[in-house]
Amino acid sequence: MTKRKLSKGQQRRVQENHKKRLQSKEKKNHVELDDTQLGEATEGLVISRFGQHADIEAADGSITRCNIRRTISSLVTGDRVVWRPALQTQENVRVNGIVEAVHERTSVLTRPDYYDGIKPIAANIDQIIIVSAILPELSLNIIDRYLVACETLNIEPLIVLNKVDMLDAESRAMVSEWMQIYKDIGYRVLEVSSYTKEGLEALTQALIGRISIFAGQSGVGKSSLLNTLLPPMEESILVNQVSDNSGLGQHTTTASRLYHFPLGGDVIDSPGVREFGLWHLTPEQVTKGFIEFRPFLGGCKFRDCKHNDDPGCLITEAVDKGEIAPTRFENYHRILESMSQVKVRKNINLDS
């Protein structure tokens, strides 16, 4: 018997009921600690967040699972906080502290959600590592979508092309030519292989002293790269076997978590950055997200120029003169077209 397809309203009610059940269970497991049971306030770092609890790393590197004060409206991996440890560790109780306050963020990585608006998924990020690969398929369009997201969030990107060991000399030269497009407009690009270790030293140096997050589609080798770069851990970032037929891996991260690199710097591994939706952006924001367009903006003949076949368009003139790469220009219009096809729209405050 064919299952009846749920409407969007029904799907939303199912999702809300699911959240209520989870919250109800969390309340039953919630252990309250009063002030007499708590030590002095101290600084900490959110390593991971689980519902009403968070794992907090102290200055000595120890990790304590804590309750979160109900007055804290938003807490994500990467947040720097003030917390208080329990004076005595309680037997059979996993929660041994409480988060009291959150420091102001230097940046916040967000993603759009159809029902909940803009959702924060990580804080204090310095750079986004855009991981792409020749398998399952090298898509410059997807790279450009990530770059627009980075520019909109004002977080520096680093493009990492993985699995270059699978290219022959001719294909490698062609791919390097494509990557030169991004280098020419000021983006950093690294060609690496987690298998042969090519380019990993340069990537390691780029990660030192920064908080990074790896973004990319499933199968491009994000988890393999992280397992190569990180020290051996009891709980490693799992990587499923890649199919011999498809060349695809499977994304196995289930909760955002922060890890430390041996030479310095941190990484947040999160399931929320498999892809960045752009449907909540305006066409103007997408246009500004193509950094090589910016010198020409405001100079077109018509104020409502669509930068396509409009007469007097400085951007199309720049493409004709070779000042803007045709592939980037084509991907710009592909992104706008994909946004126009999204029928569901919600008014979202991007500053929230």
UniProtKB/Swiss-Prot annotation:
Which compartments is it annotated to reside in? Cytoplasm
Arranged from A to Z, the UniProt key words for this protein are: Cytoplasm, GTP-binding, Hydrolase, Metal-binding, Nucleotide-binding, Ribosome biogenesis, RNA-binding, rRNA-binding, Zinc
Out of the domains of life, which is the source? Bacteria
- Residues involved in GTP binding: N162, K163, V164, D165, G216, Q217, S218, G219, V220, G221, K222, S223, S224
Q: Where is the composition biased (Basic residues)?
A: 1-11
Catalytic activity, EC: 3.6.1.-
The protein's role, per its UniProt record: One of several proteins that assist in the late maturation steps of the functional core of the 30S ribosomal subunit. Helps release RbfA from mature subunits. May play a role in the assembly of ribosomal proteins into the subunit. Circularly permuted GTPase that catalyzes slow GTP hydrolysis, GTPase activity is stimulated by the 30S ribosomal subunit.
Q: What is this protein called?
A: Small ribosomal subunit biogenesis GTPase RsgA
